[in-house]
Amino acid sequence: MVSAVYPGTFDPMTRGHEDLVRRASNIFDELVVGVAHSPNKRPFFSLEERISIAREVLGHYPNVRVEGFSGLLKDFVRKNNARVIVRGLRAVSDFEYEFQMAGMNRYLLPDVETMFLTPSDQYQFISGTFVREIAVLGGDVSKFVFPSVERWLQEKIAKPE
């Protein structure tokens, strides 16, 4: 059985993220979506909210599990006995950062491979940052996120903490 980890902040989970999960879940026996705590990124949604959102969006995939984590990715990968780290590449601008991360992960986890997936064409430009900015400014994000995620965004914007 080959398990993979797809780590990210998922702030919020977008249709682009789900596209990668769908495709990766067809490749691996088990896919663990690791929702990173990422306090340095100052996420819009709390870790618990991001986990709940991801579970709502991805709950229908029988071989996909969503878990939160903090600390080093290498520890999360080991905990889940994963052999592959899945990463998305939207554009050339993502490549340099992801290439460096893959190199560091190879150093820390020599027996774990990093696999890059590019999103389907209609999702190439979507990012959680863009989605949040559009939503906060009152724009329509329905083409970028699922209805449940749009509701989460609207509720969070209406009741900021």
From Swiss-Prot:
Which residues of this protein are annotated with the site description Transition state stabilizer?
Answer: 17
Q: Which GO terms describe its biological process?
A: coenzyme A biosynthetic process
Q: Kindly indicate where the leader peptide sits in this chain.
A: none
Can you state which reaction this protein catalyses? (R)-4'-phosphopantetheine + ATP + H(+) = 3'-dephospho-CoA + diphosphate
- What GO CC annotations are associated with the protein? cytoplasm
Q: What is its main location?
A: cytoplasm
Q: Name the pathway.
A: Cofactor biosynthesis; coenzyme A biosynthesis; CoA from (R)-pantothenate: step 4/5
Give the top-rank taxon of the lineage listed in the UniProt record for this protein.
Bacteria
InterPro entries assigned:
Cyt_trans-like (IPR004821), PPAT (IPR001980), Rossmann-like_a/b/a_fold (IPR014729)
Q: Which residues bind ATP?
A: 9-10, 17, 88-90, 98, 123-129
Q: Where in the cell is it found?
A: Cytoplasm
Residues bound to substrate: 9, 41, 73, 87
> What keyword terms does UniProt attach to this protein?
ATP-binding, Coenzyme A biosynthesis, Cytoplasm, Magnesium, Nucleotide-binding, Nucleotidyltransferase, Transferase
Mention any Pfam family matching this sequence: CTP_transf_like
Which EC numbers does the record give? Answer: 2.7.7.3
Q: Name one GO molecular function term.
A: ATP binding
Give the required cofactors: Mg(2+)
Outline what the protein does.
Reversibly transfers an adenylyl group from ATP to 4'-phosphopantetheine, yielding dephospho-CoA (dPCoA) and pyrophosphate.
- Name the protein family: Belongs to the bacterial CoaD family.
Its name, as the record gives it, is: Phosphopantetheine adenylyltransferase
Species this protein is from? Cupriavidus taiwanensis (strain DSM 17343 / BCRC 17206 / CCUG 44338 / CIP 107171 / LMG 19424 / R1) (Ralstonia taiwanensis (strain LMG 19424))
Starting at the broadest rank, the lineage of the source organism is: Bacteria, Pseudomonadati, Pseudomonadota, Betaproteobacteria, Burkholderiales
Gene that this sequence comes from? coaD
